[in-house]
Amino acid sequence: MKKHLLFWSILFCNAAVAQTFSGGTGTKSDPYLISNVNDLKELSNMTDTPGADGTQQTYGKFFRLTQDITEPFVGIIGYEGFFKGDFDGGGHCITLNINMPTDNYVGLFGTVKSGAVHDLAVSGSVVGCNYVGGIVANPTNEALLYNLCNYADVKSTSTSMLSCVGGVIGGIISKAEGTMQGATVSCCANYGNVSSDGCALGGVIGYSGQQTGNTISDVANYGFVESSNSKRIAGTIGNPMWNDKVHRIANFGMLSSEDFSGCIGNANPTDIGEIIYDRQMAHSSVSIPAQERNTAELLGEGQKETLGDSWVYADGMLPRPNMNGLENSDIAVLYATPVILADGDKLDSVTKNFRVSLGNVENGKVVWKANNGLVEIQGDGTAIIHGAGTEVLTATYNSASRNVAIIIKGTDGINSINVSRNTGDDVWRNLSGQAVSTPTHGIYIRNGKKVIVR
Protein backbone atom coordinates (compact mmCIF):
# COMPACT_ATOMS: atom_id res chain seq x y z
CA MET A 1 0.00 0.00 0.00
CA LYS A 2 2.84 2.40 0.88
CA LYS A 3 4.45 1.69 -2.51
CA HIS A 4 1.24 2.74 -4.24
CA LEU A 5 1.06 5.95 -2.17
CA LEU A 6 4.70 6.71 -2.98
CA PHE A 7 4.02 6.16 -6.69
CA TRP A 8 1.07 8.57 -6.71
CA SER A 9 2.99 11.14 -4.64
CA ILE A 10 5.86 11.11 -7.15
CA LEU A 11 3.39 11.33 -10.03
CA PHE A 12 1.62 14.30 -8.40
CA CYS A 13 4.87 16.16 -7.76
CA ASN A 14 6.05 15.61 -11.32
CA ALA A 15 2.69 16.86 -12.61
CA ALA A 16 3.00 19.93 -10.40
CA VAL A 17 6.14 21.12 -12.16
CA ALA A 18 5.04 20.27 -15.71
CA GLN A 19 3.43 23.27 -17.41
CA THR A 20 1.31 23.43 -20.55
CA PHE A 21 1.19 27.13 -21.46
CA SER A 22 0.99 28.38 -25.05
CA GLY A 23 4.77 28.35 -25.20
CA GLY A 24 7.97 29.27 -23.40
CA THR A 25 10.05 27.74 -20.65
CA GLY A 26 9.56 30.38 -17.95
CA THR A 27 12.94 32.09 -18.23
CA LYS A 28 13.46 35.82 -18.70
CA SER A 29 14.51 35.31 -22.33
CA ASP A 30 11.83 32.67 -22.99
CA PRO A 31 8.85 33.44 -20.73
CA TYR A 32 5.76 31.28 -20.43
CA LEU A 33 3.25 32.61 -22.97
CA ILE A 34 -0.29 33.42 -21.82
CA SER A 35 -2.70 33.55 -24.76
CA ASN A 36 -6.12 32.38 -23.51
CA VAL A 37 -8.26 31.58 -20.48
CA ASN A 38 -6.83 28.05 -20.25
CA ASP A 39 -3.36 29.54 -19.80
CA LEU A 40 -4.67 31.77 -17.00
CA LYS A 41 -6.20 28.72 -15.33
CA GLU A 42 -2.87 26.93 -15.64
CA LEU A 43 -1.12 29.87 -14.01
CA SER A 44 -3.71 29.87 -11.22
CA ASN A 45 -3.12 26.16 -10.60
CA MET A 46 0.64 26.67 -10.70
CA THR A 47 0.40 29.49 -8.16
CA ASP A 48 -1.76 27.52 -5.73
CA THR A 49 0.16 24.21 -6.00
CA PRO A 50 3.57 23.82 -4.30
CA GLY A 51 6.40 22.36 -6.36
CA ALA A 52 8.07 19.01 -5.74
CA ASP A 53 10.33 20.57 -3.09
CA GLY A 54 7.47 22.48 -1.48
CA THR A 55 8.50 25.88 -2.88
CA GLN A 56 6.34 28.38 -4.73
CA GLN A 57 6.40 27.30 -8.39
CA THR A 58 6.17 30.84 -9.79
CA TYR A 59 9.29 32.01 -7.92
CA GLY A 60 11.85 33.24 -10.45
CA LYS A 61 9.54 32.45 -13.39
CA PHE A 62 8.54 34.87 -16.14
CA PHE A 63 5.17 35.10 -17.90
CA ARG A 64 4.04 37.25 -20.84
CA LEU A 65 0.55 37.96 -22.12
CA THR A 66 0.57 37.75 -25.92
CA GLN A 67 -2.86 39.20 -26.75
CA ASP A 68 -6.09 40.59 -25.28
CA ILE A 69 -8.20 37.89 -23.63
CA THR A 70 -11.87 38.72 -24.19
CA GLU A 71 -13.33 35.47 -22.87
CA PRO A 72 -14.08 36.34 -19.23
CA PHE A 73 -11.73 34.84 -16.66
CA VAL A 74 -13.60 33.89 -13.47
CA GLY A 75 -10.73 32.69 -11.29
CA ILE A 76 -7.98 34.20 -9.17
CA ILE A 77 -4.23 33.83 -9.60
CA GLY A 78 -2.89 33.28 -6.09
CA TYR A 79 -6.02 32.50 -4.08
CA GLU A 80 -4.73 29.60 -1.98
CA GLY A 81 -1.08 30.49 -2.54
CA PHE A 82 0.69 33.60 -3.80
CA PHE A 83 2.30 34.79 -7.04
CA LYS A 84 6.05 35.37 -6.82
CA GLY A 85 7.08 35.62 -10.47
CA ASP A 86 7.13 38.34 -13.13
CA PHE A 87 3.93 38.88 -15.15
CA ASP A 88 4.34 41.11 -18.21
CA GLY A 89 0.97 42.07 -19.66
CA GLY A 90 2.56 43.34 -22.87
CA GLY A 91 0.10 46.26 -22.93
CA HIS A 92 -2.84 43.86 -23.37
CA CYS A 93 -6.19 43.61 -21.55
CA ILE A 94 -7.80 40.68 -19.71
CA THR A 95 -11.59 40.58 -19.33
CA LEU A 96 -12.72 39.52 -15.84
CA ASN A 97 -15.98 38.22 -14.43
CA ILE A 98 -15.05 37.41 -10.84
CA ASN A 99 -18.07 37.10 -8.54
CA MET A 100 -17.00 35.95 -5.06
CA PRO A 101 -19.03 38.22 -2.72
CA THR A 102 -18.15 36.32 0.49
CA ASP A 103 -14.44 35.80 -0.23
CA ASN A 104 -11.41 37.90 0.66
CA TYR A 105 -8.33 38.67 -1.47
CA VAL A 106 -10.28 38.92 -4.71
CA GLY A 107 -8.84 40.27 -7.98
CA LEU A 108 -7.06 38.95 -11.05
CA PHE A 109 -4.16 38.32 -8.65
CA GLY A 110 -5.09 37.46 -5.07
CA THR A 111 -1.71 37.87 -3.35
CA VAL A 112 1.53 38.99 -5.01
CA LYS A 113 4.45 38.40 -2.64
CA SER A 114 7.66 40.06 -3.81
CA GLY A 115 6.59 39.40 -7.40
CA ALA A 116 6.06 41.84 -10.27
CA VAL A 117 2.96 42.63 -12.33
CA HIS A 118 3.25 45.27 -15.02
CA ASP A 119 2.07 46.61 -18.40
CA LEU A 120 -1.43 45.18 -17.99
CA ALA A 121 -5.06 46.29 -18.18
CA VAL A 122 -8.22 44.54 -17.00
CA SER A 123 -11.88 45.12 -17.83
CA GLY A 124 -15.21 43.59 -16.79
CA SER A 125 -16.32 43.08 -13.20
CA VAL A 126 -14.79 42.07 -9.85
CA VAL A 127 -16.90 41.42 -6.73
CA GLY A 128 -15.47 40.31 -3.38
CA CYS A 129 -15.65 41.00 0.36
CA ASN A 130 -12.45 42.35 1.96
CA TYR A 131 -9.22 43.18 0.11
CA VAL A 132 -10.66 43.57 -3.37
CA GLY A 133 -8.74 45.06 -6.31
CA GLY A 134 -9.19 44.96 -10.05
CA ILE A 135 -5.65 43.73 -10.71
CA VAL A 136 -4.05 42.84 -7.35
CA ALA A 137 -6.02 42.32 -4.14
CA ASN A 138 -3.01 42.15 -1.79
CA PRO A 139 0.54 42.99 -2.86
CA THR A 140 3.03 42.36 -0.08
CA ASN A 141 6.72 42.45 0.81
CA GLU A 142 8.70 43.88 -2.11
CA ALA A 143 5.94 43.53 -4.71
CA LEU A 144 6.58 45.65 -7.80
CA LEU A 145 3.52 46.97 -9.62
CA TYR A 146 3.74 49.43 -12.50
CA ASN A 147 2.02 50.42 -15.75
CA LEU A 148 -1.33 49.00 -14.63
CA CYS A 149 -4.73 50.13 -15.86
CA ASN A 150 -8.15 49.14 -14.50
CA TYR A 151 -11.33 49.52 -16.57
CA ALA A 152 -13.37 47.02 -14.53
CA ASP A 153 -16.10 47.81 -12.02
CA VAL A 154 -14.81 46.76 -8.59
CA LYS A 155 -17.25 46.14 -5.74
CA SER A 156 -16.91 45.02 -2.13
CA THR A 157 -19.81 43.60 -0.13
CA SER A 158 -18.02 44.34 3.15
CA THR A 159 -19.05 46.90 5.76
CA SER A 160 -15.81 46.40 7.70
CA MET A 161 -13.63 49.17 9.10
CA LEU A 162 -10.86 47.73 6.92
CA SER A 163 -12.52 46.62 3.67
CA CYS A 164 -9.48 47.62 1.59
CA VAL A 165 -10.98 48.18 -1.87
CA GLY A 166 -9.34 49.86 -4.85
CA GLY A 167 -9.66 49.94 -8.61
CA VAL A 168 -6.11 48.67 -9.19
CA ILE A 169 -5.02 47.45 -5.73
CA GLY A 170 -7.15 46.44 -2.74
CA GLY A 171 -4.87 46.64 0.28
CA ILE A 172 -1.13 46.43 0.87
CA ILE A 173 -1.51 44.60 4.15
CA SER A 174 1.17 42.10 5.10
CA LYS A 175 4.29 43.11 6.98
CA ALA A 176 7.64 43.19 5.20
CA GLU A 177 10.22 41.02 6.95
CA GLY A 178 13.82 41.75 7.98
CA THR A 179 15.61 44.16 5.68
CA MET A 180 12.90 43.99 3.01
CA GLN A 181 11.40 47.25 1.85
CA GLY A 182 7.72 47.73 1.16
CA ALA A 183 5.81 47.42 -2.08
CA THR A 184 6.41 49.82 -4.98
CA VAL A 185 3.47 51.09 -7.03
CA SER A 186 3.98 53.50 -9.94
CA CYS A 187 2.29 54.70 -13.13
CA CYS A 188 -1.15 53.21 -12.54
CA ALA A 189 -4.66 54.47 -13.32
CA ASN A 190 -8.26 53.54 -12.58
CA TYR A 191 -11.18 54.21 -14.93
CA GLY A 192 -13.77 51.86 -13.41
CA ASN A 193 -16.45 52.34 -10.77
CA VAL A 194 -15.21 51.42 -7.28
CA SER A 195 -17.80 50.82 -4.56
CA SER A 196 -18.11 49.53 -0.99
CA ASP A 197 -20.05 50.39 2.14
CA GLY A 198 -16.99 49.60 4.23
CA CYS A 199 -13.94 51.73 4.98
CA ALA A 200 -10.50 52.08 3.35
CA LEU A 201 -11.72 52.69 -0.20
CA GLY A 202 -9.90 54.50 -3.00
CA GLY A 203 -10.07 54.85 -6.75
CA VAL A 204 -6.62 53.28 -7.23
CA ILE A 205 -5.60 51.87 -3.81
CA GLY A 206 -7.84 51.14 -0.84
CA TYR A 207 -5.27 50.76 1.92
CA SER A 208 -1.51 50.93 2.23
CA GLY A 209 0.12 50.06 5.50
CA GLN A 210 1.57 47.51 7.92
CA GLN A 211 4.81 47.40 5.96
CA THR A 212 8.10 49.22 6.41
CA GLY A 213 7.14 51.98 4.03
CA ASN A 214 5.51 51.49 0.65
CA THR A 215 6.40 53.75 -2.26
CA ILE A 216 3.48 55.06 -4.33
CA SER A 217 4.01 57.51 -7.18
CA ASP A 218 2.43 58.75 -10.41
CA VAL A 219 -1.03 57.24 -10.01
CA ALA A 220 -4.39 58.73 -10.98
CA ASN A 221 -8.08 58.03 -10.64
CA TYR A 222 -10.56 58.94 -13.38
CA GLY A 223 -13.38 56.65 -12.23
CA PHE A 224 -16.33 56.97 -9.84
CA VAL A 225 -15.84 56.21 -6.12
CA GLU A 226 -19.04 55.32 -4.26
CA SER A 227 -19.86 54.45 -0.64
CA SER A 228 -22.49 55.08 2.02
CA ASN A 229 -19.63 55.24 4.54
CA SER A 230 -17.29 58.19 4.95
CA LYS A 231 -14.22 56.90 6.80
CA ARG A 232 -10.87 56.31 5.10
CA ILE A 233 -12.38 57.00 1.68
CA ALA A 234 -10.78 59.16 -1.00
CA GLY A 235 -10.59 59.71 -4.71
CA THR A 236 -7.26 57.94 -5.25
CA ILE A 237 -5.83 56.36 -2.06
CA GLY A 238 -8.23 55.63 0.78
CA ASN A 239 -5.78 55.13 3.62
CA PRO A 240 -2.01 55.56 3.19
CA MET A 241 0.02 55.14 6.37
CA TRP A 242 2.49 57.52 7.97
CA ASN A 243 5.63 55.68 6.79
CA ASP A 244 4.61 55.51 3.11
CA LYS A 245 6.28 57.60 0.43
CA VAL A 246 3.47 59.18 -1.60
CA HIS A 247 4.20 61.53 -4.50
CA ARG A 248 2.53 62.82 -7.68
CA ILE A 249 -0.97 61.55 -7.00
CA ALA A 250 -4.06 62.89 -8.80
CA ASN A 251 -7.82 62.44 -8.77
CA PHE A 252 -9.84 63.57 -11.77
CA GLY A 253 -12.82 61.31 -11.01
CA MET A 254 -16.15 61.82 -9.28
CA LEU A 255 -17.13 61.03 -5.69
CA SER A 256 -20.57 60.00 -4.44
CA SER A 257 -20.24 62.09 -1.27
CA GLU A 258 -18.60 65.36 -0.34
CA ASP A 259 -17.57 63.69 2.94
CA PHE A 260 -14.77 61.85 1.11
CA SER A 261 -11.27 63.27 0.76
CA GLY A 262 -10.57 64.62 -2.71
CA CYS A 263 -7.40 62.60 -3.34
CA ILE A 264 -5.97 60.78 -0.29
CA GLY A 265 -7.73 59.98 2.96
CA ASN A 266 -7.23 59.45 6.67
CA ALA A 267 -3.52 59.18 7.54
CA ASN A 268 -0.94 61.75 6.48
CA PRO A 269 2.39 60.18 5.44
CA THR A 270 5.46 62.12 6.52
CA ASP A 271 6.99 61.78 3.03
CA ILE A 272 4.28 63.19 0.81
CA GLY A 273 4.01 65.74 -1.98
CA GLU A 274 2.50 66.77 -5.30
CA ILE A 275 -1.11 65.82 -4.55
CA ILE A 276 -3.86 67.36 -6.71
CA TYR A 277 -7.54 66.82 -7.40
CA ASP A 278 -10.29 68.38 -9.48
CA ARG A 279 -12.54 70.18 -7.00
CA GLN A 280 -15.30 70.63 -9.59
CA MET A 281 -15.57 66.89 -10.27
CA ALA A 282 -14.64 65.63 -6.78
CA HIS A 283 -16.49 68.09 -4.55
CA SER A 284 -15.13 67.47 -1.06
CA SER A 285 -15.87 69.11 2.28
CA VAL A 286 -12.46 67.83 3.40
CA SER A 287 -10.86 70.83 1.76
CA ILE A 288 -7.09 71.03 1.29
CA PRO A 289 -6.58 74.26 -0.71
CA ALA A 290 -3.03 73.40 -1.78
CA GLN A 291 -4.36 70.30 -3.56
CA GLU A 292 -7.49 71.75 -5.19
CA ARG A 293 -7.69 72.77 -8.84
CA ASN A 294 -10.43 73.85 -11.23
CA THR A 295 -10.73 71.60 -14.26
CA ALA A 296 -9.42 74.30 -16.60
CA GLU A 297 -6.23 74.58 -14.53
CA LEU A 298 -5.49 70.89 -15.05
CA LEU A 299 -5.53 70.88 -18.86
CA GLY A 300 -2.48 70.70 -21.08
CA GLU A 301 0.80 71.34 -19.27
CA GLY A 302 -0.90 73.32 -16.51
CA GLN A 303 0.30 70.88 -13.84
CA LYS A 304 3.57 69.70 -15.38
CA GLU A 305 5.60 71.56 -12.79
CA THR A 306 3.72 69.63 -10.10
CA LEU A 307 3.43 66.17 -11.67
CA GLY A 308 6.72 66.04 -13.55
CA ASP A 309 7.95 64.01 -16.51
CA SER A 310 6.29 60.65 -15.78
CA TRP A 311 2.99 61.99 -17.14
CA VAL A 312 1.68 62.64 -20.65
CA TYR A 313 0.31 66.11 -21.45
CA ALA A 314 -1.78 67.32 -24.40
CA ASP A 315 -3.66 70.55 -25.11
CA GLY A 316 -7.23 70.46 -23.84
CA MET A 317 -6.74 67.16 -22.00
CA LEU A 318 -6.08 66.02 -18.45
CA PRO A 319 -2.64 64.64 -17.58
CA ARG A 320 -2.20 60.85 -17.80
CA PRO A 321 0.45 58.71 -16.09
CA ASN A 322 2.86 57.36 -18.69
CA MET A 323 1.96 53.66 -18.66
CA ASN A 324 4.10 52.50 -21.58
CA GLY A 325 1.31 52.99 -24.12
CA LEU A 326 -1.74 52.12 -22.01
CA GLU A 327 -2.34 55.86 -21.55
CA ASN A 328 -3.28 55.98 -25.25
CA SER A 329 -6.08 53.41 -25.09
CA ASP A 330 -9.52 54.58 -26.22
CA ILE A 331 -10.79 54.57 -22.64
CA ALA A 332 -7.77 56.47 -21.29
CA VAL A 333 -8.10 59.15 -23.97
CA LEU A 334 -11.86 59.44 -23.42
CA TYR A 335 -11.56 59.96 -19.66
CA ALA A 336 -8.83 62.55 -20.17
CA THR A 337 -11.32 64.75 -22.08
CA PRO A 338 -13.43 66.33 -19.33
CA VAL A 339 -16.42 68.57 -18.88
CA ILE A 340 -14.95 72.03 -18.21
CA LEU A 341 -17.31 73.96 -15.96
CA ALA A 342 -17.27 77.67 -15.29
CA ASP A 343 -15.46 78.88 -12.20
CA GLY A 344 -17.55 78.21 -9.09
CA ASP A 345 -19.77 75.56 -10.68
CA LYS A 346 -19.76 71.86 -9.80
CA LEU A 347 -21.35 68.84 -11.43
CA ASP A 348 -24.32 68.98 -9.07
CA SER A 349 -24.74 72.74 -9.36
CA VAL A 350 -24.26 74.09 -12.89
CA THR A 351 -25.38 77.69 -13.39
CA LYS A 352 -23.36 78.88 -16.39
CA ASN A 353 -22.63 77.76 -19.92
CA PHE A 354 -19.57 75.52 -20.06
CA ARG A 355 -17.29 73.60 -22.43
CA VAL A 356 -16.50 69.97 -23.18
CA SER A 357 -13.05 68.83 -24.24
CA LEU A 358 -12.80 67.37 -27.73
CA GLY A 359 -9.35 65.92 -27.09
CA ASN A 360 -6.13 66.45 -28.97
CA VAL A 361 -5.49 63.12 -30.63
CA GLU A 362 -4.48 61.88 -34.05
CA ASN A 363 -7.32 59.38 -34.49
CA GLY A 364 -10.24 61.79 -34.38
CA LYS A 365 -12.03 63.94 -31.84
CA VAL A 366 -14.15 62.94 -28.89
CA VAL A 367 -17.84 63.34 -29.78
CA TRP A 368 -20.29 64.62 -27.17
CA LYS A 369 -24.08 64.67 -27.12
CA ALA A 370 -26.72 65.79 -24.61
CA ASN A 371 -29.49 63.24 -24.08
CA ASN A 372 -32.21 65.28 -22.37
CA GLY A 373 -32.30 68.42 -24.51
CA LEU A 374 -31.25 70.79 -21.73
CA VAL A 375 -27.85 71.52 -23.26
CA GLU A 376 -26.77 72.26 -26.81
CA ILE A 377 -23.20 71.22 -27.61
CA GLN A 378 -21.67 73.17 -30.48
CA GLY A 379 -18.94 72.04 -32.84
CA ASP A 380 -16.18 73.82 -30.93
CA GLY A 381 -17.16 72.19 -27.63
CA THR A 382 -19.16 75.13 -26.25
CA ALA A 383 -22.15 73.89 -24.24
CA ILE A 384 -25.18 76.21 -24.12
CA ILE A 385 -27.73 75.67 -21.36
CA HIS A 386 -31.38 75.70 -22.46
CA GLY A 387 -33.09 74.68 -19.24
CA ALA A 388 -32.82 73.48 -15.66
CA GLY A 389 -32.79 69.87 -14.50
CA THR A 390 -30.61 66.80 -14.86
CA GLU A 391 -28.73 66.41 -18.13
CA VAL A 392 -26.79 63.31 -19.14
CA LEU A 393 -23.85 63.97 -21.45
CA THR A 394 -22.47 61.07 -23.48
CA ALA A 395 -18.90 61.17 -24.79
CA THR A 396 -17.65 58.72 -27.43
CA TYR A 397 -14.17 58.04 -28.75
CA ASN A 398 -13.72 55.15 -31.18
CA SER A 399 -14.87 52.03 -29.27
CA ALA A 400 -15.21 53.72 -25.86
CA SER A 401 -18.07 55.76 -24.39
CA ARG A 402 -19.04 57.19 -21.02
CA ASN A 403 -21.82 59.23 -19.44
CA VAL A 404 -21.49 62.33 -17.27
CA ALA A 405 -24.57 63.52 -15.37
CA ILE A 406 -24.85 67.19 -14.45
CA ILE A 407 -27.52 69.04 -12.49
CA ILE A 408 -28.41 72.42 -13.97
CA LYS A 409 -29.73 74.87 -11.41
CA GLY A 410 -30.59 77.56 -13.96
CA THR A 411 -28.64 80.31 -15.69
CA ASP A 412 -27.25 83.28 -13.75
CA GLY A 413 -28.87 86.63 -14.52
CA ILE A 414 -32.18 85.42 -16.00
CA ASN A 415 -35.04 84.95 -13.55
CA SER A 416 -38.24 85.54 -15.53
CA ILE A 417 -39.75 85.76 -18.99
CA ASN A 418 -39.03 89.03 -20.77
CA VAL A 419 -41.74 89.79 -23.37
CA SER A 420 -40.73 92.54 -25.80
CA ARG A 421 -42.93 94.48 -28.23
CA ASN A 422 -39.96 96.15 -29.92
CA THR A 423 -39.76 96.06 -33.67
CA GLY A 424 -36.96 94.07 -35.21
CA ASP A 425 -36.24 90.39 -35.46
CA ASP A 426 -39.39 88.70 -34.14
CA VAL A 427 -38.02 85.21 -34.83
CA TRP A 428 -37.24 82.93 -31.88
CA ARG A 429 -33.57 81.94 -31.94
CA ASN A 430 -31.42 79.76 -29.70
CA LEU A 431 -28.27 81.18 -28.15
CA SER A 432 -26.19 80.12 -31.15
CA GLY A 433 -28.41 82.23 -33.43
CA GLN A 434 -30.32 79.41 -35.11
CA ALA A 435 -34.02 79.97 -35.77
CA VAL A 436 -36.44 77.86 -33.69
CA SER A 437 -39.98 77.30 -34.96
CA THR A 438 -41.53 76.29 -31.63
CA PRO A 439 -39.60 77.25 -28.48
CA THR A 440 -39.78 74.83 -25.56
CA HIS A 441 -38.23 75.15 -22.11
CA GLY A 442 -34.98 77.06 -22.26
CA ILE A 443 -33.32 80.35 -23.10
CA TYR A 444 -33.84 82.10 -26.43
CA ILE A 445 -33.20 85.41 -28.22
CA ARG A 446 -36.18 87.38 -29.54
CA ASN A 447 -36.32 91.01 -30.60
CA GLY A 448 -32.72 91.38 -29.50
CA LYS A 449 -33.34 90.27 -25.91
CA LYS A 450 -32.77 87.08 -23.96
CA VAL A 451 -35.99 85.30 -23.06
CA ILE A 452 -36.38 82.29 -20.78
CA VAL A 453 -39.32 79.99 -21.40
CA ARG A 454 -40.27 77.91 -18.36
Where are the language model's segments positioned?
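Predominantly extracellular beta-rich ligand-binding scaffolds that present long acidic/polar faces
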Residues: 19-335
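Residue-level detector of functionally pivotal "anchor" positions at catalytic/ligand-binding pockets or at interdomain
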Residues: 335-345, 407-432
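A short beta-strand micro-motif common to beta-rich folds, especially ectodomain repeats
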Residues: 389-398
